[in-house]
Amino acid sequence: MGARENSSGGNNHYFKVSGSGLLYQSSREPKEGFEEHISEKTGAVSYWRVFWNGIEGYLSDINVREMDFNGIKAKYVSIKISDEDGNYFINVPLMTQKGGINSYVKSLVRYLPNIDLKRKVVINPAHARKGDQYAPGNFFISYARETPDGKDELIQQYYKNGQNGWPDRVESTDIMGNKKFDYTAQDTFAFQVFKQYLEKFKAENEKSEQNRGQSIGATPTAQTPPPSYATQAPSQTPPPSYQQ
């Protein structure tokens, strides 16, 4: 059922994540189901439709695209969720303004080895806590409930708290006595894992395209979700894990 609230439009639907962790679609013009949104930074008026309950479907692709938002070009990670009704793309920046890996991308990487691609998932960003301006910057990814009265099953993160080679942040103190954190080792490790999955999805989708081309003219068959990928360590030796 894709978006757990009805999402009007064609077969492709595009979503962003706000600073407060809201999953939303936006429009420059008024639309049914969209509410006026005024940017606190610029005062610009747009129209948002928020999807509080996330996106449901099969994780069918992850890729990196260069996009132009408000005249600024940047690389975005596009997370593609698919079901029988269409495709749903969640776009988040690949990098931070300081040159690190975006926290949503690292959050996705933490889950990837444990996601069974043959099962429907639900993906939803964590929302900002009451009184906080910004969200923590991570996703919740669960297996979708199988019955209307069932419950989603939260997927365990494969990489967390130094497990499976995931480096902790490195804490230090500047000359003024203020604490600061270095994420270089963590970002390097996360990006190596991320690149492996980009290649896996690319290879699988190319294979699917070839099979689709060979089957032109044949009796159509129902599409099946992509196979689950076996967990592999990064191709390069990961940086050491640091204890806080």
Language-model region placement:
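OB-fold ssDNA-binding interfaces and closely related basic DNA-contact patches used
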Residues: M1-M95, G100, V105-P113, A128-M176, ...
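Intrinsically disordered, low-complexity repeat regions enriched in Pro/Gln/Gly/Tyr
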Residues: Q214-Q244
